Each structure stands twice: as C-alpha cells, then as structure tokens.
Design a protein with these regions (language model features):
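Auxiliary, metal-adjacent structural segments of Zn-dependent hydrolase domains
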Residues: 1-64, 71-75, 113-115, 119-121, ...
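Short amphipathic alpha-helical segments and their helix-coil junctions
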Residues: 62-64, 97-111, 147-157
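Hydrophobic beta-strand residues in large extracellular and virion-surface proteins
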Residues: 66-68, 82-83
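Post-HEXXH active-site segment of zinc metalloproteases
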Residues: 76-77, 91-125
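Short alpha-helical catalytic segment bearing the HExxH-like zincin motif
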Residues: 77-86
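Short alpha-helix boundary/capping elements
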Residues: 90-95, 122, 135, 151, ...
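Short helix/loop segments within enzyme catalytic domains
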Residues: 130-154
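Pan-zinc metallopeptidase signature
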Residues: 149-257
Length: 257
C-alpha cells in the first residue's frame, strides 16, 4: 500500500505535520514523497533488513518513499519512525550528497560496515536535537531504550582485541552518545567502556566532540567538514586508507541546509 503526503498528514499530530511541511517546503526536487507499508517494501525490495528495523527512507527515480511497517493506524511509535526518516530525507533534499553503490568490493564493504553507519550517526547528531527542540518530538527515548539493551545484552559479548572489534565498539559508543540524552544511562555506558575498552573510549570521546558540534546545524559543507575531521582522527589511530574514504567527503557541494 502506498499513501500520499496528504493522506498521511490527516493521520498525524500537528507537530509531525509541521516537521513534514518544513522538510518538503525548501526542496526543489520534483519527485513526490509517498509512504509505503511493509507489504509495499517487500514487493519492491524484499524483507526489512536487519529485522529490527521498523522504517526506512528510499529515493527512487520518480519518487521518494518512506516505508514503515504499517500505515493504517499511525500511533506514537509510527510517528517517531516517520520523524526519524523525515530527518534523513530533509538532509538529503537540502543538499547532503548521497553515497552511490560501487562495484569495488573493498570500498562497498567499508561503506556498509563503517563509513555508512558513521554518517547515519552524524546525521542523527544534526536532527535529533532539532526535532526535539523545534517540534517536540523526542527521538531520544527510543535511543535510550536501545542503549540500555546494548549495555545489558550486547556489550558484554563484544571483544576489544582486533581493529574491527575496536571500530565496532567505537561506533556503538558514539551512536548511543548521540541517540540518548538520559544522563544515567550514559553514565552507565561511560563506566562500562572505562572498564572494558578505555583505549576505545578515549578515541571515541575525541571524535564525539567533533560530532556533537553538528547539533541542529543545517549546513551541508559543515557536515562534510566534520565528517572529514572524524576520518582524520580515525586515520591517526587505525590508518584507514584514504582510497576507501566515501566520495561525498571529497566532492564539492555548495548547497545550504
């Protein structure tokens, strides 16, 4: 099932309506925005992957689609899912360049496993505070739930030995620092990392200062500049080859967000 913006607008809260309107009004892209359910997603792309993903934003040649698992009855959870994807769509519409798939296996693997997740986290750093402060939609609540689950169920099983293991720990640390604003839960994260991976925490804290400067700053060039800074810091510690860096980091983009 596909629904139009107007059909969805009639089902959502005034705050989410305002976010939806603002995310579309500044765009010159002629492609319409549609909303699809899980069945529509399966028909076009297959099953949601990973399975715990409840929503995603997909650009197509003739339209944009925000998929959520069900769109018949939009409740609080679905509203948060829509707000989350509107954040990504908004940055896309206002000039943050996408990263296209490549046939180079090493580059694509680097994007899928590290550079892509890092960019997503940094996009969250831009719009989580913006959406909460301007539209009173609190995406941090979901982040805090995931953080608590991470500390309890996932972190104990992660190792801190090889470089890939350290990078995974680093990504998770930054992710939950960005996606939660619960001081108690974050303090638990700090304590757990201090015991398990202090070396990773020290690097991540340095990266985090760069990432957190993005909060509510709607400027594509600034985003790219901050992303590049994180890669330079990472290169010092992990010697990540520049040839694997994402294309959007080096391409010129003058759009304002």
């Amino acid at each position: 099932m596909l629904k139009t913006v107007n059909e969805i607008r009639s089902q959502i809260s005034p705050n989410l309506q305002n976010l939806l309107n603002d995310s579309l009004i500044e765009s010159n892209d002629p492609r319409p925005l549609k909303f699809g359910d899980e069945q529509e997603y399966k028909a076009i792309k297959g099953n949601f992957s990973p399975t715990d993903i409840n929503a995603c934003f997909c650009p197509f040649k003739d339209k944009f689609i925000i998929f959520i698992k069900q769109i018949d009855k939009i409740k609080c959870k679905e509203e948060c899912d829509i707000a989350h994807e509107l954040g990504h769509l908004w940055l896309f519409l206002l000039g943050l360049p996408p990263e296209k798939k490549t046939t180079n296996r090493d580059r694509q693997m680097a994007w899928d496993t590290f550079f892509g997740p890092l960019r997503e986290i940094m996009e969250h750093a831009v719009y989580y505070p913006l959406i909460k402060n301007k539209y009173q939609i609190d995406l941090y609540k979901i982040g805090t739930e995931r953080l608590n689950n991470f500390i309890k169920s996932q972190l104990p099983n992660l190792k801190n030995e090889s470089e890939p293991e350290k990078l995974l720990l680093l990504l998770n640390y930054i992710k939950y620092e960005v996606e939660s604003d619960d001081h108690y839960a974050l303090e638990r994260l700090h304590n757990a990392y201090s015991k398990k991976a202090l070396d990773v925490k020290n690097i991540a804290d340095r990266l985090l200062r760069v990432v957190q400067e993005l909060a509510s700053i709607r400027d594509a060039q600034f985003f790219i500049s901050q992303y590049r800074k994180t890669l330079k810091i990472l290169d010092i510690h992990f010697c990540i080859p520049v040839k694997l860096w994402p294309n959007f980091v080096t391409q010129i983009n003058t759009c304002r967000l």
